[in-house]
Amino acid sequence: MAKEELIQFEGLVTEILPDARYRVQLDAGHEIVAYTAGKMKKNRIKTLAGDRVTVEMSPYDLEKGRLIFRHKDERPATSGGPPRGGAQRGGQFRRR
């Protein structure tokens, strides 16, 4: 199937299902089951319930889709403590 035939929708992840699948409520009102695209898996992009996503669907099966993009949050990040990483221990490497 050519890429030109795929349809893109935006929606909200409502539920995380087994086997790396998600239930997504589309802006159009439909609810579908979607899986994570390979590029999102490769780049370790995590998707949680409540995330805004872009879904790619085939015009032949409008019940299934593929998550191709997770939109960044509009809410400001909160500082919950000291920065993570090696800065608080004085270096990047662990002593033996």
UniProtKB/Swiss-Prot annotation:
The keyword Cytoplasm applies. Transmembrane segments: none annotated. Keywords: Cytoplasm, Initiation factor, Protein biosynthesis, RNA-binding, rRNA-binding. One of its GO terms (cellular component) is cytosol. Residues 71-96 are annotated as: Disordered. PROSITE patterns: S1_IF1_TYPE. It is found in: Cytoplasm. Residues 1-72 form the S1-like domain. Its main location: cytoplasm. GO terms for molecular function: ribosome binding; rRNA binding; translation initiation factor activity. InterPro entries: NA-bd_OB-fold (IPR012340), RNA-binding_domain_S1_IF1 (IPR006196), S1_domain (IPR003029), TIF_IF1 (IPR004368). Pfam families: eIF-1a (PF01176). Component of the 30S ribosomal translation pre-initiation complex which assembles on the 30S ribosome in the order IF-2 and IF-3, IF-1 and N-formylmethionyl-tRNA(fMet); mRNA recruitment can occur at any time during PIC assembly. One of the essential components for the initiation of protein synthesis. Stabilizes the binding of IF-2 and IF-3 on the 30S subunit to which N-formylmethionyl-tRNA(fMet) subsequently binds. Helps modulate mRNA selection, yielding the 30S pre-initiation complex (PIC). Upon addition of the 50S ribosomal subunit IF-1, IF-2 and IF-3 are released leaving the mature 70S translation initiation complex. Belongs to the IF-1 family. This is Translation initiation factor IF-1. The lineage of its organism: Bacteria, Pseudomonadati, Pseudomonadota, Alphaproteobacteria, Hyphomicrobiales. The gene is infA.
